[in-house]
Amino acid sequence: MAKFYYSDRRLACWAAGKNPHLGGSIESWLAAIKSDSSFRQTVKEDVQVNRLQPTAVRMFSWKVGSGPIDNPEKCNWHYVLTGEVPAQPTEPVKAREVVVPPVKVIPSPPPVPRPYFRPVGAFAPTRSGFIRATVERLSRKREESRAAALFAELPLEYPQGAPLVVPRGFAAMRWTYHATWRRWYDASDERALRVHPGGPALPPPPPPPPIQKPPSFEERLQAALERQSCARAFALETSLGLNMAWLGTAAIPSTSVCCADGRTTGGQTIAQEADPINHRVTSNTAPGRAQWISERRSALRRREQANSLQSLAAQTDMTFEQARNAYLGAADMVEQGLPLLPPLRNAYAPRGLWRGPSTRANYTLDFRLNGIPTGQNTLEILYNPVADEEMDEYRDRGMSAVVIDALEIAINPFGMPGNPTDLTVVATYGHERNMERAFIGSSSTFLGNGLARAIFFPGLQYSQEEPRRESIIRLYVASTNATVDADSILAAISVGTLRQHIGSLHNRTVASSVHAAQVQGTTLRATMMGNAVVVSPEGSLVTGTPEANVQIGSGSSMRMVGPLAWENVEEPGQTFTIRNRSRSMRVDRNADVGVALPRMSTTTRGLAGRGSVQVPKDCQAGRYLKTLDLRDMVSGFSGIQYEKWITAGLVMPDFKVVIRYPANAFTGITWVMSFDAYNRITSSITTTASPAYTLSVPHWLLHHKNGTTSCDIDYGELCGHAMWFNATTFESPKLHFTCLTGNNKELAADWEFVVELYAEFEAAKTFLGRPNFVYSADAFNGSFKFLTIPPLEYDLSTTSAYKSVSLLLGQTLIDGTHKVYNYNNTLLSYYLGIGGVVKGRVHICSPCTYGIVLRVVSEWNGVTNNWNQLFKYPGCYIGEDGNFEIEIRSPYHRTPLRLLDAQAASAFTSTLNFYAISGPIAPSGETAKMPVVVQIDEIALPDLSVPSFPNDYFLWVDFSAFTVDAEEYVIGSRFFDISSTTSTVHLGDNPFAHMIACHGLHHGILDLKLMWDLEGEFGKSSGGVTITKLCGDKATGMDGASRVCALQNMGCETELYIGNFAGANPNSALSLYSRWLAIKLDKARSMKMLRILCKPRGNFEFYGRTCFRV
């Protein structure tokens, strides 16, 4: 595999090529990579993931300075994309050039002038198109008045199928003007040729008018005045070159996306529009076509809104129509470009003695943004939506409260079209300290996209006395990439409200549409537990959605203290982040360190339970600390999540476990939190916690030097089934806390850390979760979860030390005299050997006063004693992140996954050897060893050998040494350990049995094969074997199919359904209503041995990852 050489320019070219939809030049990507180290690391990791792509090899396999794209002036993109290298010419370019004498071309005579009567197409000529085409000709002759008089007589458009009638005055014009018809006539209709087959001939004269009474003087005078006014109007239009244009705005459908941590506690976004740079759009189409375009645009907008709302409705219990009503309350006003706030007559019903609504909606906030604040300089504006005069007026009428039914934010930017500067406005309730609860809504846009509006229906109600504090609505304005001058006015931001004043004896008179939007918004807010719905216009001049980072409460803060008076306020802030596309909203409550708590992106997190773990001051390796029961944590806390659990009954949550402890880099302690879903290891770790148990179940490392740590538990995947609120079914979920590496420095006293459990309990739709493993012949894809090697300890007194990690990953773990089956070892035991590239990570668990330089290589048959040879081996140094990637070295290209009993691991297998080429070092007086923990994440490009038992039967159990003739064995609908008091039982040892042992539940169909041997002569044996399928129990159950096999048959076959009424069964004998199998022997002592083999049929599923001690 070629070595990659990285540079900022190469990474910028890679990022630009992978994200063509974001646009931007190579220099802009290069500036982003140089200024953001985390972004550079993200791009580098993406290159490493796709290092096998030809384009990646051509870009990064050259040394820096000699690559095809290193020189900005001579980038060979053709080679990067195609791999073609231009060959050197073998002869002069003109060696084979053939000189052809030029051919003299005789010009053709000019074409005969065509008649000016051109056919009329499907769309007849319009007045505006005809005027524009003719003004160019008449402007040269200064005949505006004559043209206006002629054109005024033309109809607006001709009906389809009607003959074309042209005035005589126009037909008498000169032949040079006939080309103007091409600008407004289509050649797809033959009506004109049918009317005038001879070419430029005058149309037939109109028939003489019928004889009638001559008009009176008044009628003739009125007709003359009308003709004169019409001629003047059209003369003015033609002289100025005006057109009656159709004016409209482009409606951009709003995109409503939930935040990454699933929190929303504010109002809901109803609609948003964008008018790109307020262009006037001139339409030369007929009115029928303009109407068709408008209807088509509306249909596309409704379809995009439906797709966005359909996904939102699918996440909640609301119907699609309910979600649409909550989010599109004022969407019908977007197309006209009007404000989104509905008129008062549409929002409120009249009330009072004189039928007058006590509402006001004219007091708005309008301010000019002079320089966009970026970074920590977030602009904060405290705004009171109700004037003091208005409050005094309605207070005298007996009103005691104000209700903000709707709030609109409008951003009208100034500057160049297409400017990618982003701008975000966040609206919150000013009297709420919790940001998530105070959130009303947010609007983000690019300044180059023009006017953008958003409307929210918060339903905010507050007292008449509160507005005097001048802080009802807080607005936060920020940008992430502003590049314009600081003293320029960039945008006008307006905030309008729709409100009403109510009293103790007054009912709210909000219209049904507004009320429905508020009710659905409240329901949505309660369902999603506060997800911030953020909108942003898309599809305008600047594509995509902005990425905002608003420091709430920090930087420049202004408070309105009067009509034209403001004051500055400084407050410690929080962070409001909007990621492009994902539209996440994160709130930073940890103001001390300034880092937001890690959150999941799929569920809303609410505190469900808590517990504490006591830590001794001298916490040594292998120390057992405490076990916390997840069910007891939730029920003991008795919070709102427990009430939801009782209501839902059956839940399958995603837990977020936050372990809060102070960071200390001098102790060197590393704890392990093990998730034991089926209570398999509790009895094995009460005295000493061996890593053979704590690292065999799903686990997480807690480093004391890192401080507070969080981890996610997908209960449906790790446990395998849902949990009932007041009793256990198959599970007994525990969190075990043990010490993996002990402390070097004893602390002053015993202490404890806090464990918080966050979850959102929603009713589960099924009992079983996702299967952890599905049996098939090629189930392994190279990736691991929770594969951690016990600590490697380096002695401080040795030099040139090394530690080896054996790659016998399919070997069963041994703890003293006990075998421990876990999932990773069992998974690899399905194969004889494996090769590939090992990817993993090294955790340095020592105190910060220790130091070491590690180099990892892969070796076969032990380690090398020649260090010069060592540095010739392929290897890598362990950096700060601890990641490593090394190919397995073996003379067989694979390493065995298990060994024979007499073989040693160091003599016949590949190992990962971690050489301390420098160190370990520590201050004087330190004697403790330096612990290092290795985690293996993946074996990339796995080179698997043949399976251990490809598509074959596994041995389940052998019965022998029968002591009675009438023997009966009950085989329940589960694969479990069978015992007997009247015969000797020997259980089979195979990968399938191990996989059953290290899972909580299993489900599928087994093909059973029964074989036996006889004691006496073959022909003299009598008796038989009866196999009966039953359901339920013997007393009240039901009998199914049955078959009898004579002993002389020496065997028979049947099948066994694994599962119960719930879907799956554990590997222990549990009395649940299910199918089972009875095997009866009437002459058991005539048999020497009874053997039962099994083979999984189809997709055999395993649920709930755990381990098992034999």
Swiss-Prot record:
GO terms for molecular function: structural molecule activity. GO terms for cellular component: host cell plasmodesma; viral capsid. Residues 200-213 have a biased composition (Pro residues). InterPro entries: Nepo_coat, Nepo_coat_C, Nepo_coat_N, Nepovirus_subgr_A_2A, Viral_coat. Residues 195-215 are annotated as: Disordered. One of its GO terms (biological process) is transport of virus in host, cell to cell. Specific enzymatic cleavages in vivo by the P1 encoded 3C-like protease yield mature proteins. It comes from the Viruses. Keywords: Capsid protein, Host cell junction, Transport, Viral movement protein, Virion. Belongs to the nepoviruses RNA2 polyprotein family. Virions are comprised of 60 copies of the coat protein. This is RNA2 polyprotein. The lineage of its organism: Viruses, Riboviria, Orthornavirae, Pisuviricota, Pisoniviricetes.
